[in-house]
Amino acid sequence: MSPNTGESNAAVYASSTQLARALYGGDLVSWIKHTHPGISLELQLDVPVKLIKPGMSQTRPVTVVRAPMGSGKTTALLEWLQHALKADISVLVVSCRRSFTQTLIQRFNDAGLSGFVTYLTSETYIMGFKRLIVQLESLHRVSSEAIDSYDVLILDEVMSVIGQLYSPTMRRLSAVDSLLYRLLNRCSQIIAMDATVNSQFIDLISGLRGDENIHTIVCTYAGVGFSGRTCTILRDMGIDTLVRVIKRSPEHEDVRTIHQLRGTFFDELALRLQCGHNICIFSSTLSFSELVAQFCAIFTDSILILNSTRPLCNVNEWKHFRVLVYTTVVTVGLSFDMAHFHSMFAYIKPMSYGPDMVSVYQSLGRVRLLLLNEVLMYVDGSRTRCGPLFSPMLLNFTIANKFQWFPTHTQITNKLCCAFRQRCANAFTRSNTHLFSRFKYKHLFERCSLWSLADSINILQTLLASNQILVVLDGMGPITDVSPVQFCAFIHDLRHSANAVASCMRSLRQDNDSCLTDFGPSGFMADNITAFMEKYLMESINTEEQIKVFKALACPIEQPRLVNTAILGACIRIPEALEAFDVFQKIYTHYASGWFPVLDKTGEFSIATITTAPNLTTHWELFRRCAYIAKTLKWNPSTEGCVTQVLDTDINTLFNQHGDSLAQLIFEVMRCNVTDAKIILNRPVWRTTGFLDGCHNQCFRPIPTKHEYNIALFRLIWEQLFGARVTKSTQTFPGSTRVKNLKKKDLETLLDSINVDRSACRTYRQLYNLLMSQRHSFSQQRYKITAPAWARHVYFQAHQMHLAPHAEAMLQLALSELSPGSWPRINGAVNFESL
């Protein structure tokens, strides 16, 4: 049950050992027996999924199946449909992915299930087909008459379908949410299946249809391809091996010498490639997929790369390659069932804008058979965070089964789970939805846990264990035999390893980027580039700087940051946006819509779609506070070399005032769960959370002050929203100019800022000596806010209008569409609409 829908399962949401297992249905059998005994429960142990044939006495209107990957769920569905589909039966299949839709229609056709149409092939926008497969985002295209008349609703991968409600591509959230809820409430026959069906979903269906109308199948069969598989999480990436092979340094020209090294990700990969093995490699990031493919190319040219920059190919073609490298573009709906690959390697990098662990888990299961039944995994924790803002919430359930976590660990993490639960209850309260608001806890949990290395590994291990995959910690053995202290030591080693190789990885990625000296896009792309520049940038930007901007935008996280910077500047220029939601909404939709031209490392242009957030009220509240902070600190990212210096006391004052509200707002907007200062700023919590998340040096450092906590919160928000780096200033005086380069006017300005009489000083030397005698007046700690290089070209402040007439004119044109009543009325202004 969702934390905001009742208390029958409330204890689970306060248990750091039970939480992950419950969210992915590990406790479903006991929960149904205890909470909904009226539901028909069928256990299918160690046999593939089998659905009750239509018309049999045990049949109920709603069938829910929880079964691991590879358990035959879709095969059982096809058999059921072959018996159920009479000429007059209508069926709606709701899919979570475009690729899944294509796979389903192919399997339906192969099984002789005729009459199905997909939304991809429909020639009409509004669809009323009798048998339709539609992706959730396009559900609003199904006619109202058809929605109310379907006999059968099929939700294969139902938890992924619900998860799509939170996707950035979900443009019509309220309409789609309402339609799916209507289908669940009214459709006469429902089949819902997933590997992670949980109590939240059962509770929803029970409330809509009644326990007596639900049959739940819990299957434990995982298939030989999974149940015999071992996943070893390696301690070290082996960055030295990667560098040696890619750069081919003279002392290691012969890569065959690498076979003598063992234990790291790249050492083991090289060894298997040298032995002639076929290898599939999963990468959670685009950049690593290209890097590891470059490494493999030293050993073989038979490589297939599947990522967002390369075309997909038919899964049957995979058998023609020795090495398959893929990202999360290969997910549910695509399965490779041949015994071709010997081993799987997996590189997983938890980060706020990357795939969550459920998406990773689903992608790991696409190759059904491995000849050696081994997965070698490296988890790169370089983008995860520790205190004072972030704390792990989870304690590993598998370890808790054999060993006892220390009571202090349990008490503190349970308290953190309760705080997270309360923050979820306060999130999206203005959302006029049924399903989106009900399942928000699971979504927020999956996204927020990406900030924690320990939580990410605990979730992934929970999911792998549900598929009977044994997880082994490198150098320690199966996780079932690992003690809490050993587990935390392993997390520490992983974090240390990732931090040690982070700079080297950045260098390798930069080496792979091509240095473009010329670009001349034409036609459609040239028009898009012109439109983008006129909308966002100042006219003074030259061609070389344009290239840098477009290359920066190839990184997905920089795209929303540029949009946010433009929106913040507009809110400062047009203060009415901070008073009237309609004005802000128009500004937001002006900048957060359309396309970005991006320039990849090969020098090719492509288009990236800008996504609009559904919860604009929350965005408005966040930008109101950010605009106030930016104005108070006089932050302008497009001046003075993108660097602004501010006093730490000014930051502290602002965040004492706005910190609590900002923490809730970034939770909703950034999916970032900042630990409350009242919880983290005490010694037991500070030491325990550092120990659990592998930050052992935190255990011996002093507890941060509230002042330091506020600085860290400011640094986080400005970095994540606008791409700015906040660092301590080491300069003697404010400003970006070094002391020896100060001009006479600069000296006068600095002296005036501390109200020192300089009337007796006429020469530069006199002013300089006077300033140096007053240097103690500038001893207060300052921070530098360094905006990204592209920010200097974004139209931000009104005094730059002469440099950006197009940007200002386009925004004013958009604002002219607002009615007079949308603008705030202040100081007794007349409401002309009422006259």
UniProtKB/Swiss-Prot annotation:
Keyword Nucleotide-binding attached: yes
Record-listed ATP binding positions: A67, P68, M69, G70, S71, G72, K73, T74
Keywords: ATP-binding, DNA replication, DNA-binding, Host nucleus, Nucleotide-binding
GO terms, biological process: bidirectional double-stranded viral DNA replication; DNA replication
Domain of life, per lineage: Viruses
Pfam families recorded: Herpes_ori_bp (PF02399)
Primary location recorded for the protein, binned into one broad class: host cell
Cross-referenced Gene3D superfamilies: P-loop containing nucleotide triphosphate hydrolases
Molecular function per GO: ATP binding; ATP hydrolysis activity; DNA binding; DNA replication origin binding
Stretches assigned to the Helicase ATP-binding domain: 54-215
GO CC annotation terms, alphabetical: host cell nucleus
Location in or out of the cell: Host nucleus
Protein role: Functions as a docking protein to recruit essential components of the viral replication machinery to viral DNA origins. In the presence of the major DNA-binding protein, opens dsDNA leading to a conformational change in the origin that facilitates DNA unwinding and subsequent replication.
Assembly notes: Homodimer. Interacts with the major DNA-binding protein. Interacts with the helicase/primase component 52 and the polymerase accessory protein.
Protein family membership: Belongs to the herpesviridae OriBP family.
Record protein name field: Replication origin-binding protein
Gene source species: Varicella-zoster virus (strain Dumas)
Lineage, top ranks: Viruses, Duplodnaviria, Heunggongvirae, Peploviricota, Herviviricetes
